[in-house]
Amino acid sequence: MISAVLTTQPVHIIGAGLAGSEAAWQVARAGIRVVLHEMRPDRMTQAHKTDGLAELVCSNSFRSDDAANNAVGLLHAEMRKLGSLVMRAADANQVPAGGALAVDRDGFSAAVTKALAEHPLIEIRREEIGGLPPEDWGNVIIATGPLTSAPLAEAIRALTDESALAFFDAIAPIVHRDSIDMSVAWFQSRYDKAGPGGSGADYLNCPMTREQYDGFVDALIEGEKVDFKDWERDTPYFDGCLPIEVMAERGRETLRHGPMKPVGLTNPHNPLVKSYAIVQLRQDNKLGTLFNMVGFQTKLNYGAQQRVFRTIPGLENAEFARLGGLHRNTFLNSPKLLDPQLRLRAAPRLRFAGQMTGCEGYVESAGIGLVAGLCAAADAIGQTLAAPPPTTALGALLGHITGGHIETIDAGPRSFQPMNINFGLFPPLATAPTHGPDGKKLRGPEKSVAKKQALSARALADLDRWIGDCLKLPAAA
């Protein structure tokens, strides 16, 4: 499908976050001109701090890079096979993070910005699109993300006659490494697991006793919160990005079974005593001078954050490079509004990508941007691209967005919700593995591992066939 055909009409892409940047790259790789519109720095958002493309506003983690055993790791592998700019920039700017792929956020954004700015077929325009695109833009990708500007959001709502749902997305605090007390904290990845660029000792761990944990939970619940704006009230949270104080309010033990779970970690300062809970910090930049507090997104006000988080053992004198925050996110009822090519049924010249479609996570957003870019490139030369097989991570995610969910439950509100990639979105195996390589019958966890590995192997094989048959390109190694 992809060929170096220069068309007179460019593809217009609105929004240069992860999805828009990846879409622009894929369209340009196909030989199609791109005009990439980004409103920053002329108009900033509540969460962005720079004018860089593909700025990471929350975590710096792309999560697991294990393609054989983890669905997001599989998505990484599929995107690499398709020449993803986001994955190339992530690989080039990785920082140690155990079994995860984490990046230096500034280096990552700079790499994406440089690649797009230097591409001869990509024009970057720093301007806000204050409403629906002009009618003479016949091939448009809207990838404006969770913080779509109000005029454009209202225009989309008016066009679709749908009230976009909204949820909160959260930012975790970042701590200066040299302010952490290493006589209390220690380096270790959970179960000593090493990952890309890592050593198996990539997280900083701060232990808590039962008494310290109980006091911390009380302080979280009692801490002063930032008041919601009128337009934020009654907005549901997305469970994958709950504020830590909301988790604490759901039950006293919630945190120690979530981001503060102590399993797989041993305190070398006191190896015979098991910690009741552990706070982990993950390296945030290549220099190793900044560490972010894993899972500590919050709506506490700045004063409460500093007071409460400095009760954590090892962080008594913590200096914060950035405190946490919370912002609203919006998404479409995509199964109803979008066709399998991610086009708006009410206006097929408009295609959507990224978090607005109902995918959740950096890599998922970029992955849907990748698919949108390939589809738009096909449209530009009068072709239609077959969707990636549903057995692949990209295809499974696309299926979730464009038709994998029930519209209503008992005539109530729609049930479509944002989703991270997971093996539950994949079609079942025709024959699930029952025996291991040694011929022994698989049981319990071994059976689950074998199933995930079989799903991943099937996905990569099917993606290679799709690349060869539909894109007419050799699959990357």
Swiss-Prot record:
One of its GO terms (biological process) is tRNA methylation. Gene3D superfamilies: FAD/NAD(P)-binding domain. Its cofactor is FAD. Its main location: cytoplasm. GO terms for molecular function: flavin adenine dinucleotide binding; tRNA (uracil(54)-C5)-methyltransferase activity, 5,10-methylenetetrahydrofolate-dependent. It catalyses: uridine(54) in tRNA + (6R)-5,10-methylene-5,6,7,8-tetrahydrofolate + NADH + H(+) = 5-methyluridine(54) in tRNA + (6S)-5,6,7,8-tetrahydrofolate + NAD(+); uridine(54) in tRNA + (6R)-5,10-methylene-5,6,7,8-tetrahydrofolate + NADPH + H(+) = 5-methyluridine(54) in tRNA + (6S)-5,6,7,8-tetrahydrofolate + NADP(+). It is an enzyme of class 2 (transferase). FAD binds at G15, A16, G17, L18, A19, G20. InterPro entries: FAD/NAD-bd_sf, MnmG-rel, MnmG_N, TrmFO. Catalyzes the folate-dependent formation of 5-methyl-uridine at position 54 (M-5-U54) in all tRNAs. This is Methylenetetrahydrofolate--tRNA-(uracil-5-)-methyltransferase TrmFO. It comes from Rhodopseudomonas palustris (strain BisB5). The lineage of its organism: Bacteria, Pseudomonadati, Pseudomonadota, Alphaproteobacteria, Hyphomicrobiales.
